[in-house]
Amino acid sequence: MTLIKIGKIVNTHGIKGELRLLSKFPYKDKVFINNMKIYIDKKDIEVINTYRKHKNFDMITLVGYNNINDVLKYKGLNVYVNKDDIMLDNNKYLDEDIIGSNVIYKGISVGEIKDIERYDKYSLLVILGKKEYLIPYNDNLVDKIDISNKKVYIKDIDGLFDI
């Protein structure tokens, strides 16, 4: 079983056991769903009862917990899901599947994806080659992703990389 981090419990909310999460996970609609099994601190297995957005936070309640005192123990802990439980649409990939991939530009390897930086409106691929490159992670620049061969093909846009 491979656990994927989807966020961190930063606080409680109210007195009925609601948890406030900070998450940059890109496919929240696939993990913050009723009856989704989550792993808190990679140990405690719980099940999501409800989910809602509140300001910049993701709010969840857990099955069997309806009091703040029952969930205080989870404050400050990371939340994970089993990778096999995430049902992504076609041509959607987890960051963990892309990180470490070789980047191909104009038929030449220009580096390896070291990280994906997620922001509210966009994401950046962090590519380490001759130097560090930051390029937008979107369909305008990424031509194809080959997960099985760990390769990401970038569209032929002049001046994007020093080759």
Map each language-model feature to its residues:
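Short Lys/Arg-rich amphipathic alpha-helical segments
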Residues: 1-163
